[in-house]
Amino acid sequence: MLLQAFLFLLAGFAAKISASMTNETSDRPLVHFTPNKGWMNDPNGLWYDAKEGKWHLYFQYNPNDTVWGLPLFWGHATSDDLTHWQDEPVAIAPKRKDSGAYSGSMVIDYNNTSGFFNDTIDPRQRCVAIWTYNTPESEEQYISYSLDGGYTFTEYQKNPVLAANSTQFRDPKVFWYEPSKKWIMTAAKSQDYKIEIYSSDDLKSWKLESAFANEGFLGYQYECPGLIEVPSEQDPSKSHWVMFISINPGAPAGGSFNQYFVGSFNGHHFEAFDNQSRVVDFGKDYYALQTFFNTDPTYGSALGIAWASNWEYSAFVPSNPWRSSMSLVRPFSLNTEYQANPETELINLKAEPILNISSAGPWSRFATNTTLTKANSYNVDLSNSTGTLEFELVYAVNTTQTISKSVFADLSLWFKGLEDPEEYLRMGFEVSASSFFLDRGNSKVKFVKENPYFTNRMSVNNQPFKSENDLSYYKVYGLLDQNILELYFNDGDVVSTNTYFMTTGNALGSVNMTTGVDNLFYIDKFQVREVK
C-alpha cells in the first residue's frame, strides 16, 4: 500500500501531464487480469475454494477513478483455471470516504478457531479476511468473515484485532503453522523497516513473537510482507522458508520491487541463512507479490501473483476505462543448485508461468539446428495476430570464437506492429555483457516518449544452463500480452516482467531474428505462436 505522502507528490506531477497521455491505447490484455473499470494495485486475499474448484483474487481497488484514491476497496475476481478471470462485485468496503480497506490476506478457518462459523458452512469455505483499515489517524488490522464462500463479508464487531498507534503499520499476511497449531501473521512496520511476526489461537488476539528488521534493501519503506514454505526443485519433499518484502520507493532500478530471503522458521522467529537480499523479478513492473493461502496440489504448494506495474509511473500509463494489470500466477520452487557463476551455487527462487489456454494457434518454427549469420535473418508475419503471443528460444554461443569487446555481438528479436512496424519491441542477448536486453521505447505513444520514469532500456544477467562441445546454451520463454511482457530464463531461474505500450490497434505480430556477428549464435529452437 503506497504511502499517502508519496501519492501526493505523484498527484502533483500528474497535474503537469496532458490528459491525452492517459488515453492513447486501450488494448486490454487477454490472459492478465484487469478490472472492468477503475484503478487496481496490490493483490490481496488469495485462496482456493476446494469445494467449488474456484480461485479467488482480491485486490486494492478504486472503482471511482483510474488513479489511486480514497475510498479504497477490496475488488474481487474468480477463476476456474488461474488464467481467465471473472470480475465480481466489491468484497470489502471502508467505513469512511477518507479511509481505505488496505492490503491484507485471506485464511480458511477449517477448525472454526474464530467461532464465526457453524456446521452449515463447509469447512473449505470458512473464509476470514485480515486487512488493514487505513484512516488519516491510524493503520489498524481488522478481520471480516464470509458466510457465502468469499463473496460478501461481515466485519468483526470488536475490530481492530491489532493496533500499534501508528499510521505506518499494514499489510497483514496470515497462515496456519501446524507444528504449534497457531495462526502466524507477518505485518509491516513500514517506516521502521520491520516485519513483525505475531501468533494467535483464534485470529482475534495476537501476540508479538519477533521482528525481522533492517535487512536487505531498505528503500523508503517496507511493504506487503509474506512468509511461506517453498519446496526444493531438486527434492520436493524438502523445503525452506522464504520471506518476501516489497520496497517502494527506492528499488535499485527505480520505484518499486520485491526482494526475498531464504531461511528457517520455528513458529517464533524467521532466521535468514545469509544477509543476502535476492530479487524476485528483475523487471520494472512486478510489485506487491502475494502467495495463495492454499492451492490445488496439481499446481504445487507455493503460488503467487503480483501487480504488474511500478509506482514511479503507474498513475500515468495509458489505459481506459481501467488502469493496471496483474501478472500471471506463478508456482514457486527453490533451485538449491543454482549456478550463480562458475564457482558458486546459491539457493534461488524459481518461477514458471501458469497459462491455461485451449485456443492457441500452432507453433511457427522459425529456426531449428542452425547457425545464425548477418545474411540469414528469420522473419514471420502473424497477420491475424491479436497482439498476444508466446515464444520459445533456445540458443547457444560459440565459445571458441573471439569477439572484440568493441563489437556489439547480439542476437536480437524484433516484435513489430502489424499496422505500423515503426513501433516495435527489441530484445535479445549480447555476448560481452552476458545479458538479455529489452528496449521498449520504440513507440509513438506520448507516455512512452515523454515520461522520464518509464525506463526504455533494461537488461538481465544470464548464465548458461549447460555447456558442451564449445557451446554455452541459454533458454528463454516469453509471453507478450497486449502491453505486458513476461520473460522466463532457463526455465524460470531468472524472471523479468515489463509493461510496454503501442498505439491502439497496432498489435505486435511481425517477428524478426537477427545478429550482428556471423557464426556466433547457434539456434537450437525458435518458435512463436498466437494466443487467442
From Swiss-Prot:
The keyword Nucleus does not apply. Pfam families: Glyco_hydro_32C (PF08244), Glyco_hydro_32N (PF00251). Keywords: Cytoplasm, Glycoprotein, Glycosidase, Hydrolase, Secreted, Signal. Coiled coil: none annotated. Substrate binds at residues 39-42, 60, 102-103, 170-171, 223, 311. Its EC number is 3.2.1.26. The active site is at residue 42. Residues 1-19 form the signal peptide. Glycans are attached at residues 23, 64, 111-112, 118, 165, 275, 356, 369, 384, 398, 512. GO terms for molecular function: beta-fructofuranosidase activity; sucrose alpha-glucosidase activity. GO terms for biological process: sucrose catabolic process to fructose-6-phosphate and glucose-6-phosphate. It catalyses: Hydrolysis of terminal non-reducing beta-D-fructofuranoside residues in beta-D-fructofuranosides. Isoform Secreted is glycosylated. Isoform Intracellular is not glycosylated. One of its GO terms (cellular component) is extracellular region. It is an enzyme of class 3 (hydrolase). Belongs to the glycosyl hydrolase 32 family. This is Invertase 1.
